[in-house]
Amino acid sequence: KLPALVSDNMVLQQATKVRLWGNATPNSSLKVRSSWDNTEYTAQVNDQGRWEIWVQTPSASFEKQQLTLENGQDKIVLHDLLIGEVWFGSGQSNMEMPLRGFWHCPIEGGNHAIATSGKYKNSIRYATIQRVGALEPKDYPVGGEWKVCDPRNAPEFGATAYFFATLLTEVLNVPVGIINCSWGGSTVEGWLPKDILLNYSDIDLSLAGNDEKIHPMLQPMIMYNGMLKPASKYTVRGFLWYQGESNV
């Protein structure tokens, strides 16, 4: 089993070691082979069935690649992978707002961006983590499948990160991957782990999970546990943070 972020169409950060992870038969071994250099890596699965491994990537390229994973019983081949620059976008509605806009809130130039998005089909990929809160850190994010950039998929791409990606791919001439992990109206407390929040006496941790008393977007730590932490294993170049209004 693999998280949705480790899937077909993903973009891997160039010229570094990237982390892959998942679940397999406990106390077994797993082999991973990369198409770009035909190197084989071996991961040991622990007694809880979890494994992770670091794989060396080459310089950025528009040439499509593959990763093959097998454990002697099952075989998974991940297709149409690109090597380039990967950025993680998070925050509240400014980061979440898609190219199609929200109700009565259109994106200036959004329709044109959607209609012409096909020109980035071989250079931009986009993954969106679903909005899920949790009281304890999760192993896998919900959602996160990588989408090719085209007029069918682009309407759901967060606009801020999309325009960042188009600029980046045009200036650097490399593939760009965006992971969008955002929740409109959220406060910064929701994106922080419990051990940090314990340092602040004005934050009431009992509000976490109490949907009857307070909206999930205003609850402490639940977005960190349900969205940010499980996606944080993915190797990226940098982090785009667009949040603040809910804390003013």
Q: What are the residue ranges of the model-derived segments?
A:
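Cell-envelope and extracellular/periplasmic
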Residues: 1-248
